[in-house]
């Protein structure tokens, strides 16, 4: 039997990049998936429906930084699937971000990164958690970053936002644990996704050095993250919460 049969998942940022792979992997393990993204996920939803059935997937276009839209997304998911068992807080600004010295980062850009990368996960948890509390179970997987463990110069907006995600995980794991809800962070290393490869500056600056820092000397791909994602979403991780799981080829020994 599929490990997530009968469960319902929301994947924010689930229409493209690494998030697309998360959506596909959850569906392949039997979960019903709501693909939620600021980009249109209907084509991916159709692809998943062909493989796993029309009742297994839905998509919604939304802005994770907008509370009203987060609330509506949760309501749509409940209307379509009846419950929410898994929340993957994946939506984030990364690929389009410029590298800037901290003295050159505009406040508007800084606030926009924080709005998407940390306010977004907060808003989703705020509106999903009551339903998980009511059913006395749930898995919240916040997507962090290996950059938090070592810092990256000229990228403080992103690194700071992901550091906040780690702190958020630790705080709410204490708050929600008594309700049977597990909250963990999955922290990828520098991953070659289709969207990531579109930013030539990031690739040029990061790819070779990322491989050099690893114990396992090769590129990281979205597929490398899926085993850990499914583990955190499944009953196999029922006694694990508040943790950061680094999937980075041994870059950071956490």
Which residues fall in each region the model found?
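Short C-terminal tail/terminal secondary-structure segment
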Residues: 94, 98-99, 150, 212, ...
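Alpha-helical segment proximal to the catalytic Tyr-Lys
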Residues: 130, 174-178, 238
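A glycine/serine/threonine-rich, flexible loop-to-helix segment
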Residues: 178, 185-214, 224
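C-terminal substrate-recognition "lid" of short-chain dehydrogenase/reductases
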Residues: 122-125, 133, 137, 218-247, ...
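Active-site helix of classical SDR
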Residues: 125, 161, 169
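Substrate-binding pocket helix/loop in short-chain dehydrogenase/reductase
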Residues: 70, 98-111, 206, 210
